[in-house]
Amino acid sequence: MNPNSPRSTYSIQFDSQVTNNGATGTNLIQASSDNELQLGNMQIKGLRFLSIPYPPNFWDGVIGLSFISQYPLKLDYDTKTLYVYERSSFIPPKNTIALKIEYALGVPLIPIQVKVNNRIFNMKVEIDTGSDRVLDMNTPFVRQNDLLGTQSPFAISRITSSDSNAGELQNVFFDEVRLGNMNFYKIPGAFSTVTEGVQASQEMDGVLGNNFLQRFNITLDLQNGYIYLEPNNLIYKPFYHFLIE
């Protein structure tokens, strides 16, 4: 929940603190236990709410893994609709890219293959629909594979994560990204130089952001450990308009 939102008129009793692992660092935030969320005609009880001070005009809150992990759901970018399914009625979608999920630092990871400078890497990356990035390689992965300095960055990005810390990314081009049975060529990605937070972690190789993920309608079945990706009408959307101008 975003306490800075002008629509935050709720009154919640925060009863503990938890560590928030952001992309560029960590911080302690307030937590409230045993809350209820109404979504459409569904009422979900026993949820923990967190207070994360995003900028006031961003959003009122973020639906996180504590909810998403309880129900199969679909993010349909074609219709801009979120579908939440009862487990008893959920049928995995057909004709999609089905990827097995693993976990690190409490977040879901998927396998992808990336070619950089004609070198092929099999990576496990976090799926982060809250990120506006494309694909960032974590700092330890970049260092271990001696990637920093192998390309002249076409831009430098300075990012701020939910913990309010900042970091720097060197934007470069990846020759190819393979996701399931689909290949994407000359993809703008980044080498991380961040020294704290998720993007400095050795527990995963990188982060796949929503600038890539939005090209698929996404079905998440976290209880059974699968993500299903279906190409949508954003599949050929430019990653960054300034690269084609």
Question: Where are the model-predicted features located?
Answer:
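Pepsin/retropepsin-fold aspartyl endopeptidases
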Residues: 1-245
